Amino acid sequence: MLKTISPLISPELLKVLAEMGHGDEIIFSDAHFPAHSMGPQVIRADGLLVSDLLQAIIPLFELDSYAPPLVMMAAVEGDTLDPEVERRYRNALSLQAPCPDIIRINRFAFYERAQKAFAIVITGERAKYGNILLKKGVTP
């Protein structure tokens, strides 16, 4: 155990967060996301909610300030989003500083970004469209 680091952050996730450089992207996905077929390394965080992990990592993780650092998947035409999901994520991310805007992109554009991500953290999140991409910034 390390002081001030949440026990929700596994050693594997801590290593990945430290190895990421500015501009690298990481996805925190819901339990339904096809993470293992995307290509990047997959970290399992079964049983944890995305919002809890976001709250745990945000004290350690600088979001990009030059490009939109937060991306979520848009609903497929004819489907609906639960606004509570984004609200939970915004609340978790705003504990250290104001939360930047979250942009939405279509499912296939999100999959393309996922294939290029540094890592994908697959969680126990069951919320539909519960995936979020974070772009790492330069640590001050």
Swiss-Prot record:
Superkingdom of origin: Bacteria
Single Gene Ontology BP annotation: fucose metabolic process
Keywords: Carbohydrate metabolism, Cytoplasm, Fucose metabolism, Isomerase
Listed transmembrane segments: none
Localization annotation: Cytoplasm
Binding-site positions, substrate: D30, M73, Y111, Y129, G130, N131
Protein name (database record): L-fucose mutarotase
Species in which this protein is naturally found: Escherichia coli (strain K12)
Lineage of origin: Bacteria, Pseudomonadati, Pseudomonadota, Gammaproteobacteria, Enterobacterales
